[in-house]
A protein has these predicted regions:
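The canonical Cys-X-X-Cys-His
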Residues: 83-93, 134, 171-183
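Central antiparallel beta-sheet cores of small beta-barrel/beta-sandwich binding domains
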Residues: 179-180, 257, 261-350, 355-358
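Immunoglobulin-like IPT/TIG beta-sandwich domains and homologous Ig-like subdomains
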Residues: 392-454, 515-517, 535-536, 543-546, ...
Length: 608
């Protein structure tokens, strides 16, 4: 396998082992997604601070972290139910701190996993309703600041992606070899708590002990022969203490700003889903005690089909939305937007906008990427269509979707950037207008902003001279066999046309995506094992790029009766686009189809 995928929903939580509770599903599979990353930081970032940290903890790694004195101030626990349910084992002190708990901050999912573990390992007696209340308190007052949570929102959004936040090879091999690095970065802890977390990993996972005790790949320059090399655990502890400590500037600034979420009203929603295109619509949020109910209407910009959903949601920490919604119509396909979905949205601290994912599927593989903007009566912009315009084009009609668009909108009120002239504007409704534009031959290529007065829709309209090449997304993908005992894990591929940008060179930073390309899809053998014929056994790829995996279990038709796992190239061939040789433009992605995930960690209760 030349590349790999990180399956964030199959990762253990930042507190260690995840334990199955009454309402959670926990599986971990041999097909957990991996990725091979180059080191992202030079070894120079690790310095003598590690040695100093060792001295500060009395030899640190020569002693048990459980014996280290806790030198940092804790965060007092002020919720009566949390004290009642947790305080028996987690002894309180005279400052209102509960042992362990007061020296950890985490996401709602992290606290939910910790509660499940206490039930399973320590016999905690707690009802589902009480657990939700404790999770809400801890996820708010012992949670993350918005700017701490945003870089790792892909964890609660259940996105499957290649992580870019791993700082060096040591932490890649010591932490992210088994779970997403976003898991530890979804919590903040004192140095002692990071040490105790390593202890728990070594106690519960045999392989973790081996990984943590190996020599670190990134050794500080202060370590010279014959000095003993630092272990991965030592380097990781120092890095996490410095970069994910309990007390941070972000938390100190956010803690006094936490307030009751006031989200009631109308929100403009725009979204995209691979293989399904773009959607615009409105969500109406109404208060329901401490929670909310929602009614959402979405319209496809490709087909015009309208979908209505209703649901509920709650907010942790004043900014972190968790919800669920359904359409009331039975889904016709696994990827049908009518399916019941869970919702994770990061809401801006000023509660004016949000961004996140509504997702479903056995592996959460289907999802709508959404942005939300509060409707206040002032103009709001959500999307434009078509997705791109070509240089030199004349009298092109561009539909603008938003809210509270002025009825007297004039050509001079709109700005599409340099080289684009607005000839006229027609307002069809407060939520849609049509602008007729000309694009100059020498208009700068790139993603242009669309502006209406002081309202800007950033990078909304690609201006391009031509589609220079294609990419298939996702570029690396993982599907799961299933259909007999376990559910299938599907995958949807899409071909996207790209521009080389201003420099005319492919693969540089100024390249930009333009729009989906009409293409057909087929599988091609990925040559790793002779005569394995993976294209025959792993599943079916339809011409639209939707992959359905085969069933799990031994297959007597395969050599050695192997399972139907395998790896292939997914090749997209454009129906009309040609390359410079006059041949149909092509691109390919890498697909691994593996066995079911037999154990999985999930916290659906945080959305209830």
């Amino acid at each position: 396998m030349t590349a790999a995928r990180k399956q964030v929903e199959n990762s253990s939580d930042g507190h260690g082992a995840a334990i199955k509770g009454k309402r959670g599903r926990n599986r971990i599979g041999a097909g957990r997604r991996r990725m091979i990353l180059a080191p992202l930081m030079a070894t120079s970032v690790l310095s003598a601070s590690i040695v100093l940290a060792q001295a500060d903890t009395g030899g640190a790694f020569a002693t048990d972290p459980a014996d280290w004195p806790e030198k940092e101030a804790g965060i007092p626990v002020t919720d009566a139910l949390t004290v009642e349910k947790c305080g028996t084992c987690h002894a309180p002190d005279d400052k209102g701190n509960l042992s362990r708990i007061s020296w950890i901050r985490a996401t709602p999912e992290g606290w939910a996993q910790a509660i499940k573990r206490m039930v399973k390992l320590n016999g905690l007696s707690i009802t589902p309703e009480e657990a939700r209340s404790v999770t809400r308190y801890l996820g708010t007052w012992h949670g993350l600041a918005p700017e701490e949570a945003k870089p790792v929102m892909y964890i609660p959004e259940r996105r499957i992606l290649d992580e870019t936040i791993i700082p060096n090879e040591t932490l890649h091999n010591g932490c992210a070899a088994c779970h997403a690095f976003g898991q530890p970065m979804s919590s903040r802890r004192s140095r002692r708590e990071w040490g105790l977390l390593q202890n728990m990993h070594k106690a519960l996972y045999t392989q973790a002990a081996v990984q943590i005790e190996r020599d670190a790949e990134d050794q500080p320059g202060t370590i010279k022969p014959p000095m003993k090399k630092l272990t991965r655990g030592e380097v990781a502890l120092d890095w996490l203490t410095q970069n994910a400590g309990l007390h941070t500037k972000a938390w100190a600034e956010w803690r006094p700003r936490i307030r009751t979420p006031r989200l009631a009203g109308t929100w403009l929603v725009s979204g995209t889903m691979r293989g399904h295109g773009r959607f615009v619509g409105e969500m109406t949020i109404a208060p329901d005690g401490d929670d909310f109910t929602t009614t959402t209407t979405l319209r496809s910009l490709d087909t015009g089909k309208v979908l209505t959903r209703s649901g509920k949601g709650l907010v942790y920490g004043g900014y972190s939305w968790r919800g669920s919604s359904k359409s009331g119509t039975a889904p016709a396909r696994p990827d049908d937007l009518a399916a019941t979905a869970r919702e994770t949205v990061w809401i801006a601290p000023d509660q004016s906008r949000g961004e996140g994912r509504w997702y479903w599927g056995e592996y959460h593989e289907f999802g709508l990427d959404v942005t939300m903007t509060r409707v206040t009566g002032a103009p709001v912009l959500a999307a434009v269509s078509p997705l791109g315009v070509k240089t030199g084009s004349k009298a092109t009609e561009v539909h603008i979707y938003g809210a509270s668009l002025p009825t007297g909108l004039a050509a001079g009120d709109l700005d599409f950037g340099s080289g684009v002239t607005v000839r006229k504007v027609s307002v069809l409704s407060p939520s849609e207008a049509v602008a007729t534009i000309d694009v100059a031959d020498d208009a700068p290529v790139g993603q242009h902003d669309v502006a209406l007065g002081g309202v800007v829709l950033a990078r909304a309209l690609p201006v391009y001279a031509g589609i220079d090449y294609m990419k298939v997304t996702p570029e690396t993908a993982l599907a799961h066999l299933g259909g007999i005992k376990y559910g299938k894990g599907y995958e949807q591929f899409e071909a996207i046309g790209w521009s080389k940008g201003l420099d005319g060179k492919q693969g540089t930073d100024d390249d930009f995506p333009i729009m989906p390309v009409d293409a057909t899809f087929a599988m091609k053998e990925f040559q790793t094992v002779t005569y394995d014929n993976d294209t025959r056994f792993i599943g079916k790829l339809d011409p639209s790029g939707f992959f359905t995996p085969n069933v799990e279990g031994p297959n007597p038709e395969r050599r050695f009766s192997r399972n139907n796992y395998g790896e292939v190239w997914v090749v997209a061939t454009a129906k009309s686009l040609k390359n410079k040789e006059g041949q149909p433009m092509t691109a390919q992605a890498y697909l691994v189809t593996t066995v079911p995930a037999y154990k999985r960690w999930d916290q659906p209760e945080v959305s209830e």
